[in-house]
Amino acid sequence: MLKEQLKEVEHRIQAACDRAGRKREEVTLIAVSKTKPVSMIEETYQLGIHVYGENKVQELTEKYEILPKDIEWHMIGHLQTNKVKYIVGKTALIHSVDSLKLAETIEKEAAKKNCVQDILVEVNVAQEESKFGLKVDEVIPLSLIHISEPTRLDVIS
């Protein structure tokens, strides 16, 4: 069943790439593995999926320890500063850096672990109090720090 579902997803990705004039290899499929058992991840891994997204630090670290080491892990959920130490160096990309404090904490932890951590910055452009994300006026200071000083953060977007 998973094999057929994966074929359908791949077909849809290819169709979207064709419509957008992009090559399939320019697009990364991230299988969201949150709440899924290790056995299901192992099955999709055998089908060729090697990039997974988790939204909970504890689940990510548990799965990281027992699944193949060539899996590329992405942190896709809200990340608290007190949990940064558990995922820096284990994740290829942190998708939800939503504050300067969080960026600074990731930077410090990456320095401790002597690694560079790729991140995506989440910006709250609507400036809604109920939403996560940097305020628009915080983006420039983060960008200036990243440009003017050598850092352990690689801001992908």
Each language-model region and where it sits:
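Charged, compositionally biased N-terminal leader segments and the immediate start
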Residues: 1-22
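Aromatic/hydrophobic pocket-lining residues that form the small-molecule binding cavity
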Residues: 2, 6, 60, 139
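N-terminal active-site wall of soluble small-molecule enzyme domains
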Residues: 19-22, 26-91, 100-102
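Acidic (Asp/Glu)-rich catalytic clusters
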Residues: 68, 89, 107-114, 144
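Glycine-rich anion/phosphate-binding loops
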Residues: 96-105, 140
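Anionic-ligand binding region
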Residues: 129-144
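Single conserved hydrophobic/aromatic residue that forms the stacking wall/gate
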Residues: 145-157
